[in-house]
């Protein structure tokens, strides 16, 4: 019995220590990072590589687009009925920059989250296997564009909620990462949440600045990727008051026009090589015009 009590106490102390991890050093590393900065036409590209063990006890490679509220640049959505690379969607649209958008069926190619572009509904929130009414975990945040400016909303559980919205450009993804300056608690029973993956996210600062973040992943010792709680922390350290998670993994891609390597600035992992050639064909993208 004493041994059982001792083991239980040790487990409790271990879990308590885990729950009280001190992220102050990580936050300072993000806030004080000497980003490689490219000032572009109405927006800024920033890049920073955290070496092995430097951020969340791991190596991380972050790519960030910042669009000031005063910029003439606007966001839009691009889509194709057949998955194509982010660079292709961007070039067809004459975009200055782009990141991958929301989730899609990798086999069939269709969106699995609600998508409306220029007033035309192109995708719906696909139901779960046992539930035709409620939405899935990655459908619990909605990105709306008003004159090219992003607004993030939390939908209700009914998966058809977006259909009644008046905005002409709507993209559902998720989950919500930050709302009103606070991190949103995430379910911890899914590898989608707890495991490290490549990530793409959109955030908004209080002053109206829009952030588009891509975190590379799946490259041990170079870029291990982020869990969703780690992604939340990065976004809040970057000053976001609201933020939404987008499709990630092999889909995570950032494009900047006129850059080398077909405009791809990060290291997409779909080809499993640490280069700029690993774009995954996707259903949709967020573009900067």
Where do the PLM segments sit?
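Zymogen propeptides
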Residues: 20-142, 151-152
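A residue-level signal for conserved active-site and pocket-lining positions in enzyme catalytic cores
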Residues: 98, 202, 247
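Short acidic-glycine loop/turn motifs at beta-strand connectors
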Residues: 68-71, 118, 144-150, 179-180, ...
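Solvent-exposed loop/turn segments at secondary-structure junctions
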Residues: 72, 102-106, 158-160, 191, ...
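Short glycine-rich loop/turn motifs
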Residues: 59-64, 139-140, 174, 196-201, ...
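Conserved, well-ordered active-site substructure
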Residues: 109-131, 188-204, 212-238, 251-289
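Short, conserved active-site entrance elements at the starts or edges of catalytic domains
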Residues: 166-189
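Bacterial Sec-dependent N-terminal signal peptides
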Residues: 1-24
